[in-house]
Amino acid sequence: MRFLSKRILKPVLSVIILISIAVTVVLYFLTANENYLQAVKDSAKSQYASLRESYKSITGKTESADELPDHDAEVLDSIMDRLHEPLYEKDTFDPNEVLAENKQLYEEFLLQEISEPKVDNLVRSGDPLAGKAKGTILSLVRNSDLEDIISSIQQLEEEYNKNFGYPYTFLNDEEFTDEFKDGIKSILPKDRVVEFGTIGPDNWNMPDSIDRERYDQEMDKMSKENIQYAEVESYHNMCRFYSKEFYHHPLLSKYKYVWRLEPNVNFYCKINYDVFQFMNKNDKIYGFVLNLYDSPQTIETLWTSTMDFVEEHPNYLNVNGAFAWLKDNSQNPKNYDYTQGYSTCHFWTNFEIVDLDFLRSEPYEKYMQYLEEKGGFYYERWGDAPVRSLALALFADKSSIHWFRDIGYHHTPYTNCPTCPADSDRCNGNCVPGKFTPWSDLDNQNCQATWIRHSMSEEELEMY
């Protein structure tokens, strides 16, 4: 079995380490020669360090990883088998039929009336806990985005934040102008907390480890394949920053939750409960509204790199991960084949509500470090959406990931449009319930039916 040797060696090494410590303690009390004692202590320390390094080498663990699950070898083998095999055998399905079935499932689900999650712990405006979660609304924007981000803020304030008063945090790789800062403050209540931060060049610019000549060559190839933003270096910087850097910014150190807000998006329905408190009280670490397939050309080696990482750190895997969502090869089998094993399903991160504790955890941080060393943010066009989604699907319990079906949201060209009760004025009528996109040729880019089918528990389904 793949992981049997580790399970045999770990307890043996632990016993050896304990014996070394015990010998040191005994000698401490038995010897009076200070020089000899120091030599013994130094020798014991050296042996301990050597043994500990051997332990870490064999287990793939760091010191703090001892708190992570120590999976049974048989369980790990089962998970790894699932991650190495497609969900469906080739020639057992017709992608066109799968698409038709998935589209029907999605539309039927969205046409069910909804007002809010059916839980008994929603926090309303006026409740002592309303607006008190450690959360902020985050925007990574340029000075030139002022008009478009104002549009997004005004809608979010009207539909949600005027009742809860959560602060805003704005980040930019350049200094914000007075015009930008004054423009933002002018549309918000005077007591609304607003902070503006600059991203340091080390956290934004292309790392020195990237071979500039290779980057130029690879992006030239992608550009010829009409891959969007391939040759826009700042886009690569943004994807890397939102994958592995933003949650380290000093302005975010005091927060547990972030709600990401992009320029020029639309909100269609009132949200009458504190979303951050919902996350906190219902053990959710991630919230999304749209769930898409990615362009496989941009992430050609992301899955194989991820699997290499998982093989080195199997203890990071969550036994209740969203593995089937990652491995469903039935709607877009070409994506799966191109990436050598990944459906390319991902949460569209232009809207995300995320628990920063997950991003600051050892599995996520180690994963980011590994991907950074691979260089795929620049040699390919790895996006923060597939990167974040892979980490969540592999390292988190899928029940802690929540689809906010009740939130009406649009980012061109896709929409999450719920059906509000007929006697309700919660939604403004500016979107068509269940209509994912106006362009039918983009319907095959919707991965939400796959999430419904494979990842939503009965509890999640009953929540709406």
Curated annotation (Swiss-Prot):
<protein>
    <recommendedName>
        <fullName>Probable mannosyltransferase KTR4</fullName>
        <ecNumber>2.4.1.-</ecNumber>
    </recommendedName>
</protein>
<keyword id="KW-0472">Membrane</keyword>
<dbReference type="GO" id="GO:0000032">
    <property type="term" value="P:cell wall mannoprotein biosynthetic process"/>
</dbReference>
<keyword id="KW-0328">Glycosyltransferase</keyword>
<feature type="transmembrane region" description="Helical; Signal-anchor for type II membrane protein">
    <location>
        <begin position="12"/>
        <end position="32"/>
    </location>
</feature>
<dbReference type="GO" id="GO:0005794">
    <property type="term" value="C:Golgi apparatus"/>
</dbReference>
<dbReference type="GO" id="GO:0006493">
    <property type="term" value="P:protein O-linked glycosylation"/>
</dbReference>
<feature type="region of interest" description="Stem region">
    <location>
        <begin position="33"/>
        <end position="130"/>
    </location>
</feature>
<keyword id="KW-0808">Transferase</keyword>
<feature type="topological domain" description="Lumenal">
    <location>
        <begin position="33"/>
        <end position="464"/>
    </location>
</feature>
<keyword id="KW-0735">Signal-anchor</keyword>
<feature type="topological domain" description="Cytoplasmic">
    <location>
        <begin position="1"/>
        <end position="11"/>
    </location>
</feature>
<dbReference type="GO" id="GO:0000030">
    <property type="term" value="F:mannosyltransferase activity"/>
</dbReference>
<dbReference type="GO" id="GO:0016020">
    <property type="term" value="C:membrane"/>
</dbReference>
<feature type="active site" description="Nucleophile">
    <location>
        <position position="352"/>
    </location>
</feature>
<dbReference type="Pfam" id="PF01793">
    <property type="entry name" value="Glyco_transf_15"/>
</dbReference>
<dbReference type="GO" id="GO:0000324">
    <property type="term" value="C:fungal-type vacuole"/>
</dbReference>
<feature type="region of interest" description="Catalytic">
    <location>
        <begin position="131"/>
        <end position="464"/>
    </location>
</feature>
<dbReference type="GO" id="GO:0000026">
    <property type="term" value="F:alpha-1,2-mannosyltransferase activity"/>
</dbReference>
<comment type="function">
    <text>Possible glycosyltransferase that transfers an alpha-D-mannosyl residue from GDP-mannose into lipid-linked oligosaccharide, forming an alpha-(1-&gt;2)-D-mannosyl-D-mannose linkage.</text>
</comment>
<keyword id="KW-1133">Transmembrane helix</keyword>
<keyword id="KW-0812">Transmembrane</keyword>
<dbReference type="InterPro" id="IPR002685">
    <property type="entry name" value="Glyco_trans_15"/>
</dbReference>
<dbReference type="InterPro" id="IPR029044">
    <property type="entry name" value="Nucleotide-diphossugar_trans"/>
</dbReference>
<comment type="similarity">
    <text>Belongs to the glycosyltransferase 15 family.</text>
</comment>
<dbReference type="GO" id="GO:0006487">
    <property type="term" value="P:protein N-linked glycosylation"/>
</dbReference>
